[in-house]
């Protein structure tokens, strides 16, 4: 369930990056600056929302917290589809139109500045709603991981569900441009956004805490609680500001602050880079294959979750040292991205491979730093 939620999360996030250059920009007269503004504000709002998402999930519980998160971001994802109709209403007074009619109406308006201003504003609003919901995915998923896995296995569990981000990005180039080409970019947002509502129904039926789950037997409960945890006991309430006293809070925050920009930069701009430099469109088979290979290479990140368990079980290292060694190994992968630009003139496959390896390194590194927040607190 966590894997599929994260897959949907990244599918929703990728719709804009795979449609804006070839489908949305010509309609609304966007430039790279407009798209960059939208993605930057999304990232900022996502980061701010993360400050409160974990506390929200702790307060209302894992099950309800996840439902709220995916419900909000699915609504936000679907709202993107109606930005064209609303723009048509604002700039031309035509509100009761379909997607195709809205595009035709906007094309007849000569005031491109107004079209740009209105459409960018609407997409920013939709993006902020998406960010608000998506910020809850990882806190809820990590909390679920802490409930179902002992400390030594959490990095592996985290890397497995975090692979949903890669699989989501992997599925995106072979589905989203095809939907946009066949039925319009609006349907791409609606179709992918609807997946979240399907997931919500399954989550309501399936999720239960381990000690309340009839599919978890006593020996499995003992394995889960081998670190001395007892989910039946009332947890100590930790004030929000008290978290700032923990070293792992600052280590996690600083680590994500310094590294997430790398992931989001590659995620948001790689399709546009291929289009601008190599004239490879996201809707072309060549472009779909290139992006597919990019994220296929990123699946190497699964090793980042397995390696700490190997160090603990085979090398007798403690979980913390095992994670730190793993993070050091995969941090070196990002250096390969430095060769993407200078060697890119040889073939577009070189930056694809270099960036793919760098993204794998980031995701493996990220899977391990995610576990630090739950392994050294009373979760």
Report residues per predicted region.
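Conserved small/polar residues in nucleotide/adenosyl-binding loops
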Residues: 377-378
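C-terminal ends and interior cores of transmembrane alpha-helices
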Residues: 71-103, 107-116, 332-345
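Cytoplasmic helix-loop-helix junction between adjacent transmembrane helices
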Residues: 126-163
């Amino acid at each position: 369930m966590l894997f599929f939620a994260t897959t949907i999360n990244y599918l929703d996030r990728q719709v804009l990056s795979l449609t804006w250059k070839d489908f949305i920009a010509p309609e609304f007269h966007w430039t790279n600056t407009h798209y960059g503004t939208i993605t930057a504000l999304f990232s900022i709002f996502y980061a701010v929302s993360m400050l409160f998402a974990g506390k929200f999930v702790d307060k209302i519980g894992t099950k309800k917290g996840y439902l709220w998160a995916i419900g909000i971001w699915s609504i936000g994802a679907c709202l993107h589809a109606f930005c064209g109709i609303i723009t048509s209403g604002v700039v031309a007074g035509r509100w009761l139109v379909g997607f195709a009619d809205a595009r035709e109406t906007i094309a007849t308006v000569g005031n491109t500045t107004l079209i740009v201003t209105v459409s960018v504003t609407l997409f920013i609003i939709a993006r902020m709603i998406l960010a608000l919901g998506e910020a809850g995915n990882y806190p809820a998923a990590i909390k679920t991981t802490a409930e179902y896995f002992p400390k030594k296995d959490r990095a592996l569990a985290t890397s497995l569900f975090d692979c949903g981000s890669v699989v989501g990005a992997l599925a995106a180039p072979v589905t989203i441009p095809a939907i946009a080409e066949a039925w319009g970019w609006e349907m791409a947002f609606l179709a992918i956004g609807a997946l979240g509502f399907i997931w919500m129904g399954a989550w309501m039926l399936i999720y239960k805490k381990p000690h309340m789950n009839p599919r978890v037997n006593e020996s499995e409960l003992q394995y889960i609680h081998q670190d001395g945890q007892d989910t039946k006991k009332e947890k100590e309430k930790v004030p929000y500001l008290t978290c700032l006293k923990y070293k792992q809070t600052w280590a996690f925050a600083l680590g994500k602050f310094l590294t997430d920009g790398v992931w989001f930069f590659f995620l948001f701009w790689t399709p546009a880079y291929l289009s601008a430099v190599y004239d490879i469109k996201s809707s072309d088979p060549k472009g779909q294959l290139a992006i597919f290979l990019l994220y296929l290479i990123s699946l190497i990140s699964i090793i980042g979750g397995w390696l700490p368990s190997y160090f603990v079980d085979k090398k007798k290292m403690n979980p913390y040292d095992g994670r730190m060694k793993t993070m050091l190994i995969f941090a070196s992968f990002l250096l390969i991205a430095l060769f993407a630009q200078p060697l890119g003139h040889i073939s577009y496959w070189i930056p694809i491979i270099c960036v793919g390896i760098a993204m794998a390194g980031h995701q493996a590194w990220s899977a391990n730093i995610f576990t630090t927040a739950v392994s050294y607190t009373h979760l």
